[in-house]
């Protein structure tokens, strides 16, 4: 496994992260399974562990605390706060400072550590001002309890607002974002990935296999934990895309999951899939994606099968008439070789003129 530099930091992170939602009591894994999965991930070179104070009502963190007791510093340990963990307590949810402080202390205790390598804000709480979130996170960084901060499930414009505010006020900006992104849901390409490029934010991807659909198991009639509906998508939606993934996998002699993960790794910028597993065989297949590089023809086939419209204002701004009015009649003779402009991202990174 290779490593990526985490955004505008010097931290080195593996090209796959291990998701540990299944380590919680909700999943009822055999007692020795989490240890085996963690060892397998580490032996493959993985060093990023993704968990949350909400997974299994804290039991996923407790399990990790036990497993990492003698090897804590070998991993980049990340966890999250925001989601409700104490029903009945009106302040036991949200992005606000009180929930951050209480949740972080509980996570440190369960994980048996004195610091979190990266603390994610799990989802946007629109009641809490962005300034409160960023200042509260900065306080935890300055206290040494958190090394880096990340943001998950926020609108792209608010992530941009948050990092701009942090930079202007000398606070700690988000070092990474975590988003939902896969071959069945490419909506992130319109706003999130261009924004991430502008801010040097790596994208950690949850749901990279679309709740197992991109493994092809539902086409084979197998059952799964999200058998009927998952995150608003009916079971049969996207079957044509899954069939294309399966076709390419058969041509390559690889599992479909590896094709789906390799496609994510081929995306521009730093895209790091968060892989989870309930069995060692599942994890073995997912880890095997790191040595698969899809060729241009297969990438083109997948793009054709899954592309989403760019939408407004992107298509509008690229109409030839608008281009001439915005840039003048000499626009085709102007060379822009800068690498960090919004133009280079929004227009060129993902889209071709239609």
What kind of feature is each model-predicted range?
Residues 6, 18, 34, 49, ...:
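Conserved, mostly hydrophobic/aromatic
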Residues 198, 224-247, 251, 266, ...:
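Terminal-tail/helix-coil boundary detector
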Residues 1-75, 210, 344-354:
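N-terminal binding-site loop/beta-alpha segment at the start of enzyme catalytic domains
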Residues 27, 39, 43, 87-184, ...:
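Glycine/proline-rich, positively charged
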Residues 11-16, 45-47, 71-75, 113-117, ...:
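Short, well-ordered coil/turn segments that N-cap beta-strands
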Residues 21-25, 84-91, 282-285:
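A short acidic, helix-capping loop that chelates divalent metal ions and anchors anionic groups
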Residues 21, 52-54, 80-84, 121-124, ...:
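Active-site beta-loop-alpha junctions enriched in small/polar residues
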Residues 188-223, 255:
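Aromatic-lined glycan-binding groove of carbohydrate-active enzymes
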